UniProtKB/Swiss-Prot annotation:
Species per Swiss-Prot/TrEMBL record: Mus musculus
Function recorded in the entry: Plays a role in the translocation of terminally misfolded proteins from the endoplasmic reticulum lumen to the cytoplasm and their degradation by the proteasome. Plays a role in lipid droplet formation. Induces lipid droplet clustering. Recruits ubiquitin-conjugating enzyme UBE2G2 to lipid droplets which facilitates its interaction with ubiquitin ligases AMFR/gp78 and RNF139/TRC8, leading to sterol-induced ubiquitination of HMGCR and its subsequent proteasomal degradation. Also required for the degradation of INSIG1, SREBF1 and SREBF2.
Membrane-inserted regions that do not cross the membrane: 21-41
Membrane topology (Cytoplasmic): 1-20, 42-410
Residue segments, region Disordered: 258-295, 344-369
Name used for this protein in its record: Lipid droplet-regulating VLDL assembly factor AUP1
Encoding gene per record: Aup1
Modification(s) after translation: Monoubiquitinated and diubiquitinated.
An annotated GO cellular component: autophagosome
Keywords: Acetylation, Endoplasmic reticulum, Lipid droplet, Membrane, Phosphoprotein, Ubl conjugation
Residue ranges constituting the CUE domain according to the UniProt record: 296-338
Modified positions (Phosphoserine) in chain numbering: S292, S363
SUPFAM superfamilies linked: Glycerol-3-phosphate (1)-acyltransferase
Subunit structure: Identified in a complex that contains SEL1L, OS9, FAF2/UBXD8, UBE2J1/UBC6E and AUP1. Interacts with the cytoplasmic tail of ITGA2B, ITGA1, ITGA2, ITGA5, ITGAV and ITGAM. Interacts (via C-terminus) with UBE2G2; the interaction recruits UBE2G2 to lipid droplets. Interacts with ubiquitin ligases AMFR/gp78 and RNF139/TRC8; this promotes interaction of UBE2G2 with AMFR and RNF139. Interacts with apolipoprotein APOB.
GO molecular function (one): ubiquitin protein ligase binding
Length: 410
C-alpha cells in the first residue's frame, strides 16, 4: 500500500497571522482593545518574570514560581506522561513550533538549548539559550558538555528540524548531528494551541511572536514524554534520526517529510512572487482581451514547450496567463508547483525545435527524462532528491530558452 502523500511546504508553514474566517476576524477585532491592554500590562509583568528567573537558582522552586508567573502572561505549560522522563538521558529531542519551545520545556525540567547560527551575545543569554562557539565546533562542544561530570547533570534539549513549523501537518526532516552526540535520546512531542490567530508565521521574528503571545488571551503548550530510544547496533546517525522522526510524527498524528530548512527558505521566496505577478502581467500583456496578446501568449507558450517538451501546451498557456513571466512559469513547472500529466517526449515535441536540434545533440534528449521523473503522482516522490536535480534543470531550461530567443532576434 502506497504511503499517504507528504504535505508540501505550503501546509507546514503559515504565511498569514490573521484568520481568514469572517467570524473569527470579527471576534479578533472586538477583542483587540482588551488584547492591547493585556499586552501593555504583560510587558511590565514579563520584566519581573525575567528578573525573578535570573535571581533564583535553578531548582524546583524556581521552575514553579516562573511557571506560575508565565501562566499570568498567558503562556500555559502542561505535560503528560511525566513518569517516562528518564533523568539519566542527556539528550532530549523535540519537534519545533515556536521560538519559545525551549523556555516552556525548561519550566518542566532542567535543560539547555544551544542557539544555532548565532554568536554568543546578551540577547542569546536573555532568551534562555546556551552560548556556544561556532557551528563547526558545535557537535564537539556538545559532546564535551554531555560528557561532563557535573551534578546534577543538565540534559540538552535539541530541535533537529532546526526551523519551526505550524505544528499541524508534518515534521521537517531531522538533521543527523543531534543524534551523533549520544547513543540514547529521549524524544518528546510538543503541541501548541492559541485562539484567534496562528501560532507562528514563517517569516516572523521572535520579537513579533512574543508580542502576539502577550496579546492573545492564552497560549497552551502541551508536552508529552516518550520512552527513551537507543541507537541500534551499526545504525548510522541518519538512520537513527529518521527512526526518531517517524516515531515523533506518529505520536503527533502527522507525517515525517523530507523537507529541510532550505525548502522553507525557498517557499518564503515564492510567497513573495504573487505580489509581483499582477504588475508583471500588466507589463507583459498590456491589453489581455486583444488578439495580439493571445498571439504573444501562444508564442511564449511554444517557446517554453521547446524547452520543456514533456509539459502539455495547455498547462504552459494556463500558467503563463497567470504569471506573465516565462522564468517564473519554468520555475513552477520544474518545482512541481503546477500539476500535470507528462507527455511522451516524442509526442509532445513540436516542429519548431528541429532547426536547433544539432546544437544540443545529447543534452536535448537526455535532460527531459529525469525531469519527467520529477513530476510523479506522489508528492513524496517529487520531494526526493529535489535539491540535487533542481539547479541543473533551472540552468538547462533557462539557457535553452535564452539561446532560442537570441536566435530569433538575429
Amino acid at each position: 500500500m502506497e504511503p499517504p502523500p507528504a504535505p508540501g511546504p505550503e501546509r507546514l508553514f503559515d504565511s498569514h497571522r490573521l484568520p481568514s474566517d469572517g467570524f473569527l476576524l470579527l471576534a479578533l477585532l472586538l477583542y483587540a482593545p482588551v488584547g492591547l491592554c493585556l499586552l501593555v500590562l504583560r510587558l511590565f509583568l514579563g520584566l519581573h518574570v525575567f528578573l525573578v528567573s535570573c535571581a533564583l537558582p535553578d531548582s524546583v522552586l524556581r521552575r514553579f514560581v516562573v511557571r506560575t508567573m508565565c501562566a499570568v502572561l498567558g503562556l500555559v505549560a502542561r505535560q503528560e506522561d511525566s513518569g517516562l522522563r528518564d533523568h539519566r538521558v542527556r539528550v532530549l529531542i523535540s519537534n519545533h513550533v515556536t521560538p519559545f519551545d525551549h523556555n516552556i520545556v525548561n519550566l518542566l525540567t532542567t535543560c539547555s538549548t544551544p542557539l544555532l547560527n548565532s554568536p554568543p551575545s546578551f540577547v542569546c543569554w536573555s532568551r534562555g539559550f546556551m552560548e556556544m562557539d561556532r557551528r563547526v565546533e558545535l557537535v564537539e562542544s556538545l559532546k564535551k558538555f554531555c560528557a561532563s561530570t557535573r551534578l546534577p547533570p543538565t540534559p540538552l534539549l535539541l530541535f533537529p528540524e532546526e526551523e519551526a513549523t505550524n505544528g499541524r501537518e508534518g515534521l521537517l526532516r531531522f538533521s543527523s548531528w543531534p543524534f551523533s552526540i549520544q547513543d540514547v535520546v529521549q524524544p518528546l512531542t510538543l503541541q501548541v494551541q492559541r485562539p484567534l490567530v496562528s501560532v507562528t508565521v514563517s517569516d516572523a521574528s521572535w520579537v513579533s511572536e512574543l508580542l502576539w503571545s502577550l496579546f492573545v488571551p492564552f497560549t497552551v503548550y502541551q508536552v508529552r514524554w516518550l520512552h527513551p530510544i537507543r541507537r541500534q547496533l551499526g545504525e548510522e546517525s541518519e538512520e537513527f534520526a529518521l527512526r526518531v522522526q517517524q516515531l515523533v510524527a506518529k505520536e503527533l498524528g502527522q507525517i515525517g517529510t523530507r523537507l529541510t530548512p532550505a525548502d522553507k527558505a525557498e517557499h518564503m521566496k515564492r510567497q513573495r512572487h504573487p505580489r509581483l505577478r499582477p504588475q508583471s502581467v500588466q507589463s507583459s500583456f498590456p491589453s489581455p482581451p486583444s488578439p495580439s496578446s493571445d498571439v504573444q501568449l501562444t508564442t511564449l507558450a511554444h517557446r517554453v514547450k521547446e524547452v520543456l517538451p514533456h509539459v502539455p501546451l495547455n498547462v504552459i498557456q494556463r500558467d503563463l496567463a497567470r504569471t506573465g513571466c516565462v522564468d517564473l512559469t519554468i520555475t513552477n513547472l520544474l518545482e512541481g508547483a503546477v500539476a500535470f500529466m507528462p507527455e511522451d517526449v516524442t509526442e509532445g515535441s513540436q516542429s519548431p525545435p528541429a532547426p536547433s536540434a544539432p546544437k544540443f545533440p545529447s543534452s536535448g534528449l537526455a535532460t527531459p527524462q529525469p525531469t519527467a521523473l520529477t513530476f510523479a503522482k506522489s508528492s513524496w516522490a517529487r520531494q526526493e532528491s529535489l535539491q540535487e536535480r533542481k539547479q541543473a534543470l533551472y540552468e538547462y531550461a533557462r539557457r535553452r530558452f535564452r539561446e532560442r530567443q537570441a536566435q530569433e532576434a538575429e
